[in-house]
Amino acid sequence: MAIENYIPDFAVEAVYDLTVPSLQAQGIKAVLVDLDNTLIAWNNPDGTPEMKQWLHDLRDAGIGIIVVSNNTKKRVQRAVEKFGIDYVYWALKPFTFGIDRAMKEFHYDKKEVVMVGDQLMTDIRAAHRAGIRSILVKPLVQHDSIKTQINRTSERRVMRKITEKYGPITYKKGI
């Protein structure tokens, strides 16, 4: 396990800190975003006014938003359909299946997309494997679902190794 495969290109406080100008400056035409604890809190499917404004801003600028989630179709569809967001379910992160599917289905090149998520073990690792840029965000809520709690245990070990070798990951207010 090469620790470098878990280091994000950027780390920001929240997905909503990714502004249109900063994404455009990086040549980003689409944001692939994890669902639970990245776009919305896993236990609050309604989203926040801040999230709704962020979606509106990106859409107005012509930046695509595609949820790439390991969840079932039912879970993802129920969470995002009210927001009109495209999605890929059963993404199988940390493998590239969902990212590859999103880029092919929505006609994006690797240089034009970024994967945003709250987990090194799934979101960031999948982005590395797919050859796209990655952005790590802090989880929206500190309490995770049972499945995610298991990943967080491994993630803490990886984070310690990253910190020992490269120093701590520093979260900023934007890219």
Predicted regions and their residues:
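Asp-based, Mg2+/Mn2+-dependent phosphohydrolase catalytic module
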Residues: A2-V33, N44-P45, P49-I175
